[in-house]
């Protein structure tokens, strides 16, 4: 088994904290950590960066804290990204964050796409909005996305068993990407 550290960057695109988007990503990270012990996990929470992002029209005007998050994204071995669905798309500050990321830095990086919304009708946002964004970066978007509607949560905690099954399927593709034997924690 590969024992080198895998730098995982988790981007939670919600403007609120706590949020269902964060809850979905947290469940994903916990299941990933149950499978692999060689992870270095870095969280980028848009809710904590609203002021820094709105005050940074260009990369060179970004605060030191925002620069650290941008560098973490650019150096990631694996990205886990999620956003709530607003008006059939991801949040504006989520997009603005990636506007500041070097356009060549994510080439070939595997990305797990996730979204949350009020109903199942928003599930296509993953394929119609998130996947094209990361295609621009020439990132490797993994085939299974994670979408969870409000019914999958108790407050901000993921509770729906079918969602945990989807997470395991996603993690199987992550394991295959890194050529790690699949040993499901389910």
Swiss-Prot record:
Top EC class, one word: oxidoreductase
Annotated catalysed reactions: FMNH2 + NAD(+) = FMN + NADH + 2 H(+)
Induction, per UniProt: Transcriptionally activated by SfnR.
InterPro entries assigned: Flavoprotein-like_sf (IPR029039), FMN_Rdtase-like_dom (IPR005025), FMN_Rdtase_MsuE-like (IPR019912), NAD(P)H-dep_FMN_reductase (IPR051814)
Any GO molecular function: FMN reductase (NADH) activity
Assigned keywords, A-Z: Flavoprotein, FMN, NAD, Oxidoreductase
Pfam families xrefs: FMN_red
Enzyme Commission code: 1.5.1.42
Known function: Involved in the dimethyl sulfide degradation pathway. Catalyzes the NADH-dependent reduction of FMN.
Cross-referenced NCBIfam families: FMN_reduc_MsuE
Protein name, per record: NADH-dependent FMN reductase SfnF
């Amino acid at each position: 088994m590969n024992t080198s550290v895998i730098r995982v960057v988790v981007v939670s695109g919600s403007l609120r904290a706590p949020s269902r988007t964060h809850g979905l990503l947290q469940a994903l990270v916990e299941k990933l950590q149950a499978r692999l012990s060689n992870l270095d996990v870095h969280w980028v929470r848009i809710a904590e960066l609203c002021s820094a992002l709105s005050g940074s029209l260009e990369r060179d005007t970004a605060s030191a804290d925002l620069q650290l998050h941008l560098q973490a994204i650019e150096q990631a071995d694996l990205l886990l990204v999620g956003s709530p669905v607003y008006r059939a798309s991801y949040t504006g500050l989520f997009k603005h964050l990636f506007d500041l990321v070097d356009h060549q830095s994510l080439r070939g990086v595997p990305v797990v796409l996730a979204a949350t919304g009020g109903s199942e009708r928003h599930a296509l946002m993953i394929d119609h909005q998130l996947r094209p964004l990361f295609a621009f970066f020439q990132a490797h978007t993994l085939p299974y996305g994670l979408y969870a509607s409000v019914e999958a949560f108790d407050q901000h905690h993921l509770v729906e068993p079918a969602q945990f099954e989807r997470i395991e399927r996603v993690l199987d593709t992550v394991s295959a990407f890194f050529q790690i034997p699949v040993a499901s924690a389910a």
